[in-house]
Every structure is written in C-alpha cells, then in structure tokens.
Amino acid sequence: LSENLNAAFNVTEGEDYEIDYTFNTADIADSLAGIVTLRGFLNVAPVNTTSNFPGAPLTYTNQPKGHATVFGNYTLGDWSVDAQWHWFSGGTNIQVYGAGQTFYTQPYFGSFSTMDFTLTKQITFGDGTVMSAYFNVQNAFDSVPPYTVGSSGNPGSIFGGIPQGEDVMGRYFTIGVRGNL
C-alpha cells in the first residue's frame, strides 16, 4: 500500500489592521472648504517559516515583517490632491540558521519608505461625460530600497535583490487622462 504525502510545511502568523476616516473641513472651521479622506493599513507578519522535507533545516523568510500604507486625499470641487506613504520594516538576510547557514557581511537590512503625490482635475463635458486629468509623482523623495538576498522586485537590480513590491527606478512622473467608455 502506498500513499502520496506532502511532508513539507509552512507556518505563518500575522495581523492586519485598517482605519478609515472622512470629514468635511467646514466641520473644523466655517471658513474652510473641501473634504478630507484618510486611510491607513498595517500588516504585521512576524512568522513565515518553511521546511521542505522532514529533517531539513527550517527556512525563514527574508521579507520585511511589517508593512504600513497611509493614504490622504483632499478634494475641493473638481480638484483633488492625493498623498500615499508606504513603509516596510527592516529584516534579516539570514534565511537558515544552523547547518547550511550562510553568513553575510550585512546580515540585516533597514526599514524603507516612499511617498507619492497626485494632483487630479475632474472635467465634465456638456453631454455629462466625465474625465480626469492627473499629474503623479512616484517616490517623490527618490528613496532607494535596501538590498536583500533571495528576493527580487520588479524591475530588479544589478546589485542584488530588493524586497518584493519595491523598485529601484527612483522618482518618476506620470501625466494622464482617465475616463469611462
């Protein structure tokens, strides 16, 4: 009698938090106009451990353990300004402890954050069609993510891996038009 058995395992633990708040600025002072929307996300994943087969050394992820994103929007009539702050915690490049361990000159990497801004103008045509023209600055402060091992973001880097979801392009601008067909 034989049976296929997947003896590998993966242990993960984590928590997610979200908070949203919207208010009219006239509620603060009658002379103010517009609407402010704030939104925040926090993810903490302290454990992500795998083993490929019984007796194999445990492998620990080298991804950051904490991530946070905060969105802010101010809308006044047909104009809006958006800001997004994205952060991840530092982490370790060491994925295996004990037999098979690799020792790195820089075993840990630091935390990292970026800031994006968007200015949008909503345009309404005579037939009721609505379009938006926007100007966006990604990574406004030209931050460079720390280099890690065993991972790669897109477009990647000639110097090694970077945490997933990050890029090494630096600051860039986008101008565009959005509309519904």
Question: Predicted regions span which residues?
Answer:
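Gram-negative outer-membrane beta-barrel transporters
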Residues: 1-96
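Residues that define the transmembrane beta-barrel architecture of outer-membrane proteins
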Residues: 11-15, 64-68, 111-115, 129, ...
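Short, well-ordered amphipathic alpha-helices
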Residues: 16-24, 116-122, 177
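Residue-level detector of the transmembrane beta-barrel scaffold of outer-membrane proteins
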Residues: 18, 35-39, 71, 80-82, ...
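Short glycine/proline-enriched turns and hinge-like loops at secondary-structure junctions
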Residues: 30-32, 100-102, 129-130
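C-terminal beta-signal and adjacent terminal beta-strands/loops
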Residues: 46, 87-96, 121-181
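Extracytoplasmic gating/loop element in the C-terminal half of outer-membrane beta-barrel translocons
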Residues: 82-116, 120
